[in-house]
């Protein structure tokens, strides 16, 4: 029998949690999760998608973020005729106003919170799928065998995934 699976990998999970906690859009807010009490050699636990768009890897060291943002701002300054004004952490603002400097937030890691929210998300999955059909790979990644649920819910796998994540 052919099986149908849904794979869910939450995008930049730690950074997304930090953005949501602040009422910010995780897809457009420049944010890294890192412990500033350590040196700039500390590894960022997460980098938001909008910062990754500047070529910053997901597990960068903090000094790499600092250097890359300096490079980006030097280029923005050159294009803006030598002047950059206020920093912005919002990708939309930066896209529409070339006179703004790229800024970013640094959020300290909150592992207990990430585990708590991951549990809440897992409980949403349990409303639709039995635990024996959910295979947890990490705090933000699951694979679900939904073969036996599609007929029950009269949905495709894509439709079921959309219901679970909405």
Where are each of the predicted segments found?
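Gly/Gly-Pro- and Ser/Thr-rich, intrinsically disordered tail segments characteristic of DNA damage-repair
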Residues: 1-166
């Amino acid at each position: 029998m052919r099986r149908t699976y849904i794979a869910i990998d939450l995008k930049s999970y730690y950074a997304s949690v930090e953005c949501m906690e602040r009422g910010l859009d995780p897809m457009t807010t420049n944010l890294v999760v890192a412990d500033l009490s350590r040196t700039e050699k500390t590894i960022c636990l997460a980098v938001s998608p909008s910062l990754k768009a500047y070529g910053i890897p997901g597990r960068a060291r903090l000094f790499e973020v600092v250097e890359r943002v300096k490079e980006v701002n030097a280029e923005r300054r050159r294009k803006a005729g030598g002047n950059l004004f206020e920093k912005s952490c919002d990708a939309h603002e930066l896209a529409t106003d070339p006179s703004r400097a790229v800024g970013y937030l640094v959020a300290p890691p909150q592992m207990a919170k990430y585990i708590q929210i991951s549990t809440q998300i897992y409980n949403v999955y349990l409303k639709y799928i039995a635990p024996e059909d959910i295979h947890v790979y990490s705090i933000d990644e699951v694979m679900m065998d939904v073969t036996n649920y599609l007929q029950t819910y009269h949905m495709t796998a894509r439709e079921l995934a959309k219901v679970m994540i909405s």
